[in-house]
């Protein structure tokens, strides 16, 4: 009896079973309910795995809802006032999720185009490669990207990477409303059947165009399971070296972008400690507007609801808690694909159909031809070396002039060299000719030449390397000509002061007697330009990328 009471107590503690939202309905009930569950169009839609674009073509027929016995499946939608809706025969395990959306911004940070493509493909929940020959074997020091390598967001990042050195910060908000998957052996769409019928039985160079035409229409894969809802995803491209010159890091800016996004959706108050810390950082760095207005090289994606990607709910003009709430309220009736599982198209064909293997080969060939290769044998610029952790990354020795990302730590930095000194018509002694030497000054440094004895027209072959200097604030470049006597009583014959500018310059200065000519060259450090190297200069990729093996390069 005690054991019975114990088990009964456990049973009473268990949560009540949730009734299944779907049931088998009679023909008359099926006719009375005309609306499908939201988002049925997503099931069985074609997808090109290299672009992650949905094809708007459907290899699977999701319009059929009556079974052969004239029954159907109807579902009670708790997110739409328990309305009764049809479920297509091709769909199984349909479930609505909670009616509320958690207001939380997830942030990811990557430093390469490959990383952006990898994050874009992270919404695929299964191994899309299964059954395909798509495992590239690159040479040493070559990185390969396949899934998402030609997606809009990856193309955006690649374009940026060819312009400058970037870090990429992504802020994302997701809401899941429904989930379902395809039934086993779903019915094929009549148009897809017709397209398959027109395919040649074998895949080779002469039939490739026919298979490419089908892939162009339907994609490489089809959606087999899906989470529906909404997503707002904003990728901000941050110029690494420009941030360094502003006294900031990509992590600092990314953290404050996330805080501003949290405030815009009502997930965090503008009186929070994090928000106040970012406001203080803005004051320190003289940022007059918000971080998202200051750093606004962005790619925006809005899925679900009545909005499109021109409506940035995190950083745009409509970025308010009220607009975000309105968008959430629209998702039960207008959901979009948040994440999904994929299978290659060829598995829809019967095992005995020879076109199944031909289509498998065609998809494999197409996907591999679209792979993007990054050749990490590309040389680093002078003064840089390959990172021990990533052979595709060039790094520098951390110093008071540059950081490990090879970014100058402040504006105005240049490498200064002075050489080719020639004096004429000097007069330093009454009896003999001049015993001349030079003193050259800049930025607190002094460099001397040796003495040229008994010569009123001396020249010096010294190459004076002042190293990295602050061109704008180092003071004048000063060249003094002296006549050597006993050291303590040497005579100053004249001084030449010039405010140095970037570039190659020949200088001719008059002295008390005669003149002095010399050359100086001031080369702005990488990422800097202008007369005194105060302006920012983007640094694109060095040279043309090497040819790739089977697809495009980054």
From Swiss-Prot:
Q: Where in the cell is it found?
A: Cytolytic granule; Secreted; Cell membrane; Endosome lumen
Record: residues binding Ca(2+) 3:
429, 435, 483-485
Every MACPF domain range: 26-374
S-S bridge residues: 22-75, 30-72, 101-175, 241-407, 376-392, 380-394, 396-406, 496-509, 524-533
Gene Ontology annotations for the cellular component aspect, listed alphabetically: cytolytic granule; cytoplasmic vesicle; endosome lumen; extracellular space; immunological synapse; membrane; plasma membrane
The cofactors required by this protein are: Ca(2+)
Keywords assigned by UniProt, alphabetized: Calcium, Cell membrane, Cytolysis, Disulfide bond, EGF-like domain, Endosome, Glycoprotein, Lysosome, Membrane, Metal-binding, Secreted, Signal, Transmembrane, Transmembrane beta strand
Q: Which InterPro entries match?
A: C2_dom, C2_domain_sf, MACPF, MACPF_CS, Perforin-1_C2, Perforin-1_pore-forming
Residues that coordinate or bind Ca(2+) 5: 485, 488, 490
Provide the free-text tissue specificity comment from this protein's UniProt record: Detected in large granular lymphocytes and lymphokine-activated killer cells.
Residue ranges of every copy of the EGF-like domain listed in the record: 375-407
Q: Name one Pfam family in it.
A: MACPF
The answer to whether keyword Disulfide bond applies is: yes
Q: Which domain of life is it from?
A: Eukaryota
Q: State whether keyword Transmembrane applies.
A: yes
Domain C2 intervals: 395-513
Q: Which residues are glycosylated?
A: 204, 400, 548
Q: Where does Ca(2+) 4 bind?
A: 485, 489, 491
Reported modifications of this chain: N-glycosylated.
The residues that hold Ca(2+) 2 are 429, 432, 435, 454
Describe the family membership recorded for this protein in Swiss-Prot or TrEMBL: Belongs to the complement C6/C7/C8/C9 family.
Q: How does it assemble?
A: Monomer, as soluble protein. Homooligomer; homooligomerizes to form a pore-forming ring.
What is the protein name stated in its UniProt record?
Perforin-1
Species of origin reads Rattus norvegicus (Rat)
